Amino acid sequence: ELGPGDRIGVGEKGLMSVEGLLFAKYLMYRAVYWHKGVRAPTAMVKKAVLLALRDGVLEAEELYGLDDAGFFGLLRARARERGFPPFALAEAVLQGQSYPVLLDLPFDGADPRHRALLGLEARLGFEEELAARISARGPALGPLDLIVDIPEPVSFESDGAQAATPAVD
């Protein structure tokens, strides 16, 4: 229906359908995208791409419109051209290998230490610092051996409000 000012709206009869669609979207995120078994491989690929963007190995524009085959083909081509070690993370995911989840903590937005890690650059720096601290006391870890994953908030609201993104067993 058209509302005031030719804005598109949903009438009373369509409200249940829209609510059902939003609830189905939430269930899909909860069951699939937020599941720990999916989060680790997603975080591995994400880290490879973030580092490639940061280091100029990839440009954001190159990633638009790619399907999975095109995306991974681009990463493989750049790995061959430039020998970029972080792309080994994405290749491991393609081979069915995933980092194990060693610690799963709920995100606490009231905790300044958690909020500090929302920025991707800060998170990459924290990962490097944590890997160095662990290496000083135990097994040697490189900067690619550890990933802190904080799922981005996803909006299920029409006004852009953010829904919580819990990890699911």
Regions found by a protein language model. Give the residues of each.
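Histidine-centered, transition-metal-coordinating active-site segments
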Residues: 1-169
